[in-house]
């Protein structure tokens, strides 16, 4: 008696990995979810169980990077003892270490690093801003609720712009092991922390010299 073949539905990660492989091998998205599913031996419904479209899959990829970064940080015995600026620095280093392991796919999704479609980063932005707001201490105690809210908004938006500047630097970085990105993170975090909490001049000049040397515009 013939045994009926059991088809195991793919996991979310397996679908994402197959999609990334296809895009990197062909240089473009699959023609359709139906064709992509059939070529990889699973049903179209298996794809839609996790993603409404290829664009949603790509946006989800960046959100999952954030989640994996946070999981890694939370496993560190020292992370929770860090101050806000130290936590943010640790986040950057961990995130871009993970990004390096997926560099080809990330550069592909960001249109070869042109950052033309920031909508792909919208869910990541939401997660990051909530994170920045939770860890960064406001530099000034303001009793006026509206002014205090404005201060918090400015602080988290500045953190997001810093994150984007590091992201752009990393995409363009051609140094071995992307070591210049590590330097940029250190100088950028120090300069921004000094700007918000301390005397900024020396750190800002130091960061400016580094950017000028690398011929990179933040």
Each language-model region and where it sits:
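Helix-turn-helix
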Residues: 28-60
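Hydrophobic alpha-helical segments that form the core
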Residues: 150-171, 183-191
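C-terminal peripheral helix-coil segments that are non-catalytic and often amphipathic
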Residues: 172-218
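An amphipathic alpha-helix adjacent to DNA-recognition modules
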Residues: 12-17, 48-74, 78, 89, ...
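Basic, helix-initiating cap at the start of DNA-binding domains
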Residues: 1-22
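Amphipathic alpha-helical segments used for helix-helix packing
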Residues: 99-119, 133-140
């Amino acid at each position: 008696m013939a045994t009926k073949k059991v088809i195991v539905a793919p996991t979310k990660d397996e679908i994402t990995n197959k999609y990334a492989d296809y895009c990197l091998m062909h240089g473009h998205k699959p023609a359709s979810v139906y064709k992509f599913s059939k070529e990889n031996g699973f049903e179209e419904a298996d794809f839609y169980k996790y993603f409404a479209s290829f664009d949603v899959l790509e946006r989800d990829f960046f959100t999952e990077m954030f989640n994996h970064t946070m999981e890694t940080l939370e496993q560190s015995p020292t992370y929770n003892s860090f101050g806000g600026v130290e936590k943010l620095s640790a986040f950057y280093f961990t995130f871009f270490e993970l990004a390096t392991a997926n560099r080809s796919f990330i550069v592909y999704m960001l249109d070869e690093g042109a950052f033309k479609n920031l909508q792909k980063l919208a869910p990541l932005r939401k997660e990051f801003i909530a994170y920045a707001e939770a860890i960064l201490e406001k530099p000034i105690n303001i009793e006026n609720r509206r002014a205090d809210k404005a201060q918090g908004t400015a602080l988290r938006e500045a953190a997001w712009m810093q994150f984007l500047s590091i992201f752009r630097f990393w995409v363009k970085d051609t140094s071995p092991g992307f070591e210049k990105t590590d330097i940029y993170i250190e100088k950028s975090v120090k300069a921004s922390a000094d700007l918000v909490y301390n005397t900024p001049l020396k750190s800002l000049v130091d960061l400016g010299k580094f950017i000028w040397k690398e011929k990179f515009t933040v």
